[in-house]
Regions:
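Small-residue-rich hydrophobic transmembrane alpha-helices
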Residues: 52-112, 149-168, 275-339, 372-386, ...
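Transmembrane helical elements of multi-pass membrane transporters/channels
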Residues: 20-39, 141, 175, 204-208, ...
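Short runs within selected transmembrane alpha-helices of multi-pass transporters and secretion channels
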Residues: 73, 141-160, 168-176, 197-212, ...
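N-terminal transmembrane alpha-helices
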Residues: 9-46, 60-75, 79, 104-111, ...
Length: 456
């Protein structure tokens, strides 16, 4: 780290830099997923299968709404990474200030809309009647906590854009440990049920955001802004929106397909919902390395594009994809032997139907993890390069795939069809993303050549 607690990713071995930057991210994501797993285990084991299904039934809509907020925050950090790579401190600070103001506005709007529409959303999703009330209790708290989500994601994005992936992870780990403790306190001691599980999530994330504020105030002068930096500038706001909104919509568009799929699975009953919930939680844990590599590539490509080092972007993408593919093969082989034991963490072995369906879902998805590697590495690389719109279209491909499975095949073939929804989504997204990356790289290289030629 430099004196500004930042790291320059424009020099040095791409593979070494990617591993060094992604490992702290991976550690944080693993802790986050450990919390998610513990949360699900506590709900499933100490409350009921109905409570597990209720929390699981909200997963796709949470992904749609919370994912939009996270995507926007991630997009807002990309111009900052580019300005850091270009050594433009004045522009960097202006983006930091403007992103903060715009994020406050987004937080207010999103919180108000989602809280007001919470009940209607669950009805539209065909939530089973026996879990509707529990699902509402959980979802309303998550929506009310959107400002806490935006606070942490925005500030951690600021830090990562400067090459600092360690501090956000430390605060995330603190939040995850706190979250587990609060889960146990609220559910086992205070008997707050699924409401307590949601409240623990929001409270711990808010604390992690406050920790980011304290750290930045004390240790990162590069992110300190003046009153002038907080005045909205139309050109800066426009660039933030060009980067942030496509990333937010990418998450939401992808999630729309997940919502449609979840709605179809909801129609199969609580057993199917619980099965997909357990398997999805395990899968989310297993794919953390892909998410870490993706987040790394966004910062890596952003800094290198800012420094006009486009060939390093290509080399970095290849390195990240190879690392992820090797891991994919290893984890699939491991799951062949341990999948059922992981499922037993969520439900009793006596729940044979849930175990069988969860096993089928998990192994089917794991077989297609290599396409998922490419989705993460290529998409985030394109976003870091400044072409967020292309990444959004990949989200459309994923939405189409999941919607097709949910609307057409699940009603005919049942739960087995749902198992292939994500694999099909990943393959269709890759069919768009790989050519899009080649196009974006050529476009940047051509622009650089034109600038050089114009000097002579």
């Amino acid at each position: 780290m430099t004196k500004n607690n930042s790291k320059d990713l424009t020099v040095g071995s791409p593979t070494g830099l990617i591993l060094g930057f992604s490992l702290p991210l991976l550690l944080g994501m693993l802790f986050q997923q450990v919390y998610s797993l513990m949360d699900t285990i506590i709900v499933g084991r100490f409350l009921s299968v109905s409570a597990l299904a209720a929390v699981g039934s909200t997963g796709s809509i949470c992904f749609l709404i919370i994912g939009f907020c996270q995507g926007v925050c991630a997009g807002f950090s990309l111009p900052i990474a580019q300005r850091f790579g270009a050594k433009d401190e004045k522009g960097l600070k202006k983006y930091v200030g403007n992103a903060g103001i715009v994020s406050v506005i987004i937080a207010i709007i999103m919180t108000a809309l989602t809280v007001l529409l919470c009940g209607h959303i669950l009805t539209w999703m065909n939530t089973p009647g026996d879990i509707y009330d529990l699902a509402y209790q959980y979802l309303i708290v998550i929506f009310a906590g959107i400002p806490a989500t935006i606070l942490y994601n925005l500030l951690s994005g600021y830090l990562r854009s400067l090459g600092n992936s360690v501090i956000p992870v430390i605060f995330l780990i603190i939040a995850a440990v706190l979250n587990i403790g609060l889960d146990l306190l609220f559910i086992l001691v205070f008997n707050m049920g699924v409401f307590g599980a949601a409240f623990a999530t929001v409270l711990s994330q808010g604390i992690s955001g406050v920790l980011c504020i304290i750290y930045i105030a004390k240790n990162v002068p590069l992110l300190h802004v003046s009153r002038n930096d907080l005045e909205l500038d139309s050109s800066y706001v426009r660039n933030l929106m060009v980067m942030g909104l496509p990333m937010g919509f990418q998450y939401s568009i992808t999630a729309i397909g997940s919502v449609i799929l979840q709605t179809a699975v909801n129609g199969l009953g609580s057993i199917a919902v619980a099965s997909m919930t357990a398997a999805s939680r395990i899968s989310m844990f297993m794919v953390c390395p892909f998410d870490a590599l993706g987040s790394t590539m966004a910062t890596y490509s952003g800094q290198n594009v800012g420094a006009a080092k486009f060939e390093r972007v290509k080399k970095g993408l290849i390195s990240a994809s190879v690392i992820g593919s090797i891991y994919s093969v290893l984890i699939f082989v491991a799951l062949l032997f341990i999948a059922n034991y992981l499922i037993y963490l969520f439900v009793s072995p006596s729940e044979t139907e849930v175990v069988a369906q969860a096993h089928q879902f998990l192994l089917t998805n794991a077989f297609f993890y290599i396409p998922l590697v490419l989705v993460n590495t290529v998409r985030f690389t394109i976003q870091g390069m400044g072409f967020s719109g292309f990444a959004m279209f990949a989200g459309v491909a994923e939405m189409i795939a999941r919607s097709l499975i949910g609307l057409v095949f699940v009603p005919i073939f049942g739960f087995s069809a749902a198992c292939f929804a994500s694999p099909l989504a990943w393959i269709l997204a890759d069919a768009f993303l790989v050519p899009a990356f080649i196009h974006c790289l050529h476009k940047l290289q051509k622009a650089k050549s034109s600038q050089v030629t114009s000097l002579y």
